[in-house]
């Protein structure tokens, strides 16, 4: 009897630690490996792209890149993707897009990065044009370092195309409902484990004592890893098509749930939906407020990181360390987030994100505005300069804001859709994705880039008081939106329970 109990206990423990059945490993492990390779590249690109742009062009250029290059490029990429889907099989679409990224990484690693003087315009010409046309100086500087701008854009597109689109589309296509409940939670943990691995890889290859290549080619080993990783993604995808999709135990198209077509609304239709439904408008405001407030703090923080770590290598190593902490904090929030949601009200859970943003944002901006006071009173005690403390507080703010998003912010946002009737839920969610998604991601960048165009003599140092003011206004509006949405939410919940 005791042996049977012990076996049952071990069986249950195994299901908690590794909920994948033995025969399913043939499907899960290659899928997980594909995701790991995609995320290894994703997190490496995220660390490197800022290092090139911030140190060679300027922190201010990031908002211009996001608004005027990345956003249009994402639209063009989606149009090309749709066209490819019309003329090629889905399997071949995957190969074409992944091969494009692989080809670009090779081009950048062996041509654009090693020979910047050959591919970029004359530095003096760019500087003279910037002085002659100050309102457009950031556009001119971006053109002057166009290869780094292209790398930044490709890095942004990798996450959108490879992870959000191609990987999840493939995973959703071949995964049964019963499998998804076990597979997808494991994917979430794996996703965040890729971040600390990236941090270790970047820290090793960019360390001053590591001399694998010439000093001016320090990033080449990282590019080689990304090229290898991209090649492994293609091989794994090919293997799965040959060995998993032909195994009836693991893939039966008839058993895979038919995907429901999501409601698609135009930009104008989405605006009408948001302005005519107070409930949907509140949800859109939450998403916009989150995206804008994160971008406003992140821009100022990155300008301070550049002051502390002025070289590409030092800056990239620091961003790698940032991702290390972000990965573990995200895992911690994933584990505790569901418990918080079970034990507190919707209002309390939804308030955690804006209050955390307000408190950490206030601490970050305080260390910038009152750096002279801090230098006199706290530097000796804390054995750190005001700049170091500001960068540290900014990193904590960024780590927490991204960690809490996936566990609490997204969960409470999705819970808010549940009490709505089916028509409003489907159309409202589509409207929020169109308006909230676009304005949330690009809103902060639009504010910053417009400010720098109107006031060309300003950099982040001069503009920080204005960005801080906008940040606090946005977060306060966010808090009021949560309160307003909670009232509407409780009315619908009580109505549905009757």
From Swiss-Prot:
One of its GO terms (molecular function) is ATP binding. It is found in: Cell membrane. InterPro entries: ADP_ATP_car_bac_type, MFS_trans_sf. GO terms for cellular component: plasma membrane. The keyword Transmembrane applies. GO terms for biological process: ATP transport. ATP binds at residues 436-442. Its main location: membrane. Residues 1-33, 89-92, 169-184, 240-279, 342-348, 401-438, 487-498 are cytoplasmic. Disulfide bonds join 37-85. Keywords: ATP-binding, Cell membrane, Disulfide bond, Membrane, Nucleotide-binding, Transmembrane, Transmembrane helix, Transport. It is a multi-pass membrane protein. It comes from the Bacteria. Pfam families: TLC. The chain crosses the membrane at residues 34-54, 68-88, 93-113, 148-168, 185-205, 219-239, 280-300, 321-341, 349-369, 380-400, 439-459, 466-486. Residues 55-67, 114-147, 206-218, 301-320, 370-379, 460-465 are extracellular. Provides the rickettsial cell with host ATP in exchange for rickettsial ADP. This is an obligate exchange system. This energy acquiring activity is an important component of rickettsial parasitism. Belongs to the ADP/ATP translocase tlc family. NCBIfam families: AAA (TIGR00769). This is ADP,ATP carrier protein 1. It comes from Rickettsia prowazekii (strain Madrid E). The gene is tlcA.
């Amino acid at each position: 009897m005791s042996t049977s109990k012990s076996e049952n206990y071990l069986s249950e423990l195994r299901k908690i630690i590794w909920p994948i059945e033995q025969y399913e490993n043939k499907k899960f492990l290659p899928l997980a490996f594909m995701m790991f390779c995609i995320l290894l590249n994703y997190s490496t690109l995220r660390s490197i792209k800022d290092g090139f742009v911030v140190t060679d062009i300027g922190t201010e250029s990031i908002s211009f890149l996001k608004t005027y290059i990345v956003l249009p490029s994402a639209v063009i990429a989606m149009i090309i993707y749709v066209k490819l889907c019309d003329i090629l099989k889905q399997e071949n679409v995957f190969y074409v897009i992944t091969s494009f990224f692989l080809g670009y990484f090779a081009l950048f690693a062996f041509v654009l990065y090693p020979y910047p003087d050959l591919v970029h315009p004359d530095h003096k010409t760019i500087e003279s044009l910037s002085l002659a046309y100050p309102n457009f100086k950031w556009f001119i500087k971006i053109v002057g370092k166009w290869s780094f701008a292209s790398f930044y854009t490709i890095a942004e597109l990798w996450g959108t195309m490879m992870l959000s689109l191609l990987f999840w589309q493939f995973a959703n296509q071949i995964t049964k409902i019963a499998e998804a409940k076990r597979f997808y939670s494991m994917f979430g943990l794996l996703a965040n484990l890729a971040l600390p691995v990236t941090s270790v890889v970047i820290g090793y290859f960019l360390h001053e004592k590591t001399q694998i290549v010439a000093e001016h080619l320090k990033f080449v080993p990282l590019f080689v890893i990304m090229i290898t990783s991209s090649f492994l993604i293609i091989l794994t995808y090919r293997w799965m098509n040959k060995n998993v999709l032909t195994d009836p135990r693991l893939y039966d198209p008839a058993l895979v749930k038919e995907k429901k077509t999501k409601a698609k609304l135009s930009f104008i239709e989405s605006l009408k939906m948001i302005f005519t439904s107070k409930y949907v408008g509140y949800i859109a405001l939450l998403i916009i407020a989150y995206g804008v407030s994160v971008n406003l703090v992140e821009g100022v923080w990155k300008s301070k990181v550049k002051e502390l770590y002025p070289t590409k290598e030092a800056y990239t190593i620091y961003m790698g360390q940032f991702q290390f902490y972000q990965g573990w904090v995200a895992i911690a929030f994933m584990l505790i987030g569901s418990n918080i949601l079970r034990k507190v009200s919707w209002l309390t859970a939804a308030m955690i994100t804006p209050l955390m943003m307000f408190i950490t944002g206030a601490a970050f901006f305080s260390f910038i505005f009152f750096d002279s006071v801090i230098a006199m009173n706290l530097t000796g005690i804390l054995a750190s300069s005001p700049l170091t403390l500001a960068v540290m507080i900014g990193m904590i703010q960024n780590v927490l804001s991204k960690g809490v998003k996936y566990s609490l912010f997204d969960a409470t946002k999705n819970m808010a859709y549940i009490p709505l009737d089916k028509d409003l839920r489907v159309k409202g969610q589509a409207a929020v994705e169109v308006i909230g998604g676009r304005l949330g991601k690009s809103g902060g960048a639009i504010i910053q880039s417009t400010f720098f165009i109107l006031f060309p003599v300003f950099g982040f140092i001069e503009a920080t008081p204005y960005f801080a003011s906008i940040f606090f206004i946005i977060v306060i509006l966010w808090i009021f939106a949560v309160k307003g949405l909670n009232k509407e939410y409780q009315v619908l919940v009580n109505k549905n329970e009757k």
